[in-house]
Amino acid sequence: MNDIKERVARGLLAIGAVFLRPEEPFTWASGIKSPIYCDNRLILTAPDVRSEVEAAIAETVRREFPEAEARMCTATAGSAHAAIAAHLMGLPMGYVRSGAKDHGRQNRIEGKLTEGEKVVVIEDLISTGGSLIETVEALREAGAEVLGAVSIFTYGMEKGKQRLAEAKVRAVSLTDFDEIVAVAEAEGYIPAHTVPGLMAFRANPSDESWMGGKK
């Protein structure tokens, strides 16, 4: 697993899908100042990294959730990754909308789902865990047995871990914030003196003291 974590981290950094900028923080929609920006959509534009990531998703599902009978994902964010990985495994795939459509059959869950079907949710990233939990709850309400989730990347935030534990969602990620920072430092993407601030951000994103007075 550690080998996967490092390979995926290297790939995401190489294509700019994960970008670290501790000295010029990004601003998230929530208003939080962040030293990291993640855009896993860029994986789809890089065939070598895409192949690595989708194969890693399939390998992780086989290892962690061998009973899986189908793949589900959140609409748009994890759709392409779930579709490719499901194809590699020969499993059916569907996705869950944030809300039911207001036209047609008014489906929230797209794709065939049978009562008691054992599914794994594919996510592109996990921060606070909110969207993943909503997806899992929708699948459970529809009668699925959700074995867990696989994400490409996780910030590893304590709030997210706590929320997932409370919702009884087991989540496994290909790589995480700590691995990204370690690889980024080793390969010269960031200077060593920025690492303590990065780790302080991960521990408490709402506390801007990690910026050392910068606003």
Q: Model-derived features: where do they sit?
A:
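PRPP-associated nucleotide enzymes
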Residues: 1-122, 130-215
